[in-house]
Amino acid sequence: MNVSFEDVVEAGARCLQQEGVEPSTAEAVVRHMATADLWGRHSHGLTTRFAAAVASARSGAGRRRPSVIDDAGARLVLDDTNGFGYGAGVMATDHLIERAGDHSLASVALRN
């Protein structure tokens, strides 16, 4: 049986969403884990970490959302409130690219 990468991501994200994880965070978590498996980094892949991600979601960690705690134009600090980190990393990268375009130079810090 062959299953496409996108089908794996979609199915895994649906599982996390059923536990209350926001769609964009669920997709980021599963996409990163599935990519780790594709690259042979199974210690960070679905087979090793997905069950723990579901357990974290059930405990409420997956329902937390990153928040901006300091915004100074080219500098931004985000707090992930002990969430998954995957979605916050994507958010931080998106902010960094946008702010670098606006200010020619930018920094984004991500904590917790």
Give residue spans per PLM region.
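Glycine-rich anion/phosphate-binding loop at the beta-strand->alpha-helix junction
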Residues: 105-112
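N-terminal and secondary-structure boundary signal
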Residues: 18-20, 35-42
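Generic N-terminal amphipathic, Lys/Arg-enriched alpha-helix
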Residues: 1-19
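Active-site cofactor/substrate anionic-group-binding motifs, chiefly glycine-
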Residues: 44-100
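Flexible, glycine/charged-enriched surface loops at secondary-structure junctions
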Residues: 20-28, 43-45
